[in-house]
C-alpha cells in the first residue's frame, strides 16, 4: 500500500496523523491524504466543509416537519431540539436562518 485516503472529521484526521507517525517510525513509505468532511463545519479556512450542507438541509427539513406536526395537533407545547455540532453552532444557525427566511415552517429558534 502506497497511498491511504482518509475521509472524515476531527477523529479521522487525528487517527490519520497517528498512523502517519507510526508508519514513519517503522520506515514504511506510504502517503496519507486527508479529505476533510464533517457536519460540524469546523475545519479552519474552509467555508463549507463537505458533509455540512447536507446535514444543514436535513436539520431544516426535520425541524420543519416537527413544527408542522405541532401545528397539526394544535397544542401549546414547547419543543426543544438539540442538533450536532461539537463546539460550533453552524447547524443550529442554518436552521435558524431557514426559519427566519421562510425556507423552514416559520419556526423560532433560540441559538
Where in this protein do the model-derived segments appear?
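Accessory alpha-helical/coil subdomains and C-terminal extensions
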Residues: 6-8, 14-18, 22-29, 33, ...
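Short gly/pro/ser/thr-enriched loop/turn and capping motifs at secondary-structure boundaries
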Residues: 13, 38-42
